[in-house]
Amino acid sequence: AAGKTAKSILISCGARLAPFDIEELRELMSYDELELDTLGDRKTALFLIMSDTDDTFNFVIAILQSQLFNLLCDKADDEYNGKLPVHVRFLLDEFANIGQIPRFDKLIATIRSREMSASIILQSQSQLKAIYKDAAEIILDNADSTLFLGGRGKNAKDISENLGRETIDSFNTSENRGTQVSHGLNYQKLGKELMTQDEIAVMDG
């Protein structure tokens, strides 16, 4: 049984490390020319571009992002009394395609105090939940602003619920034309969604 377990571990490890059989990837990962530790010192733009049709090497982006978050957090604490001198903003477009960044639910809650912020850009919230499972709710709770550019289904429902409800004044008039004409007026306060799911679905993006 022990032999089978060891063999299973080796097979699993071999599958995970298989991309490093590619010489170009080994060369790319063998030395550092990005100087990630300088990003919080001066204004710098770093673009990470990945294929939108082949996710073979997306894990490299996830590793880099994880290393960058942790490196800058340590740098802020060790060198700048907990806050970087230059704000670092992460624009994480196609965030779901990057792959899972380890401990991202913890990082997103702590980077703000260190003069860092992250914009998470998704096609739908379900993408986030598919990758981060229960931690997706924590990540969403730590996003203080939501920019919605249109959509249907559950996305529109979630946005409608998050917007909440409003109170409206309702007036109903009635008229009775019997032997004597009489008029009635009924007033009540009603609650309704600030924007319904249908209204959100057809709004201009």
Region locations from a protein language model:
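P-loop NTPase motor core of the ASCE superfamily
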Residues: 43-46, 106-109, 127-205
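Preference for short coil/turn "hinge" residues that link or interrupt alpha-helices
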Residues: 29-32, 91, 121, 152, ...
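P-loop NTPase motor domains
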Residues: 1-116, 131, 141, 201-204
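Acidic, glycine-rich active-site loops and adjacent beta-strand->loop/helix elements
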Residues: 96, 124-126
